[in-house]
Amino acid sequence: GVYQHAGPEIGVASTKAFTSQVAILVILAVLLGRQREMSYVTGQRLVKELARIPDLMRRVIAREDEIKSLAKKYQSRGNFFFLGRKYNLPVALEGALKLKEISYIHAEGYGAGELKHGPIAMIDEYMPSVFIAPQDSVYEKMISNIQEVRARRGPVIAIATEGDYDIRAIADDVIYIPKTL
């Protein structure tokens, strides 16, 4: 086994366990990549980026008042969708789980590519969807998914990369996160 170094769990929502598991997977991927074709420079860049995560998390936490305001706006909603693609699918699943664990509000996480295969039928003006939509290789597909939800009058909360002001035109609310690799 691998010791996570997450420390003792104090609450039900074990976000630090999820975060430490992701960090371990990144380190494992770099180790395996270095044994194959990954260059030393690329491996170093990934490890340095991983070391930046605590500071980047502090930047997001500094937006506490903005996020509390959003929580108040949506507190009466009884259901939420969390949607992500590729590497952000586990983040969407974890986000839905955390909302359920902490607030006892029903939430489901889905791969955004599966939206048309059932979940879209649940979208209406009372069903907010949280999109994990950083500017990455599947960004345009996420924008298309957001537009599908908007066409059904569904409220959209986007988790987007700092500096992505275009997403404001199609999302009701945006929480910005720092740009990473």
Regions found by a protein language model. Give the residues of each.
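Active-site phosphate/pyrophosphate-binding segments
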Residues: 1-128
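Short, well-ordered loop/turn and helix-capping segments at boundaries between secondary-structure elements
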Residues: 24, 30-34, 105, 135, ...
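Glycine-rich, anion-gripping cofactor-binding loops and their flanking helix/strand elements
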Residues: 114-150, 179-181
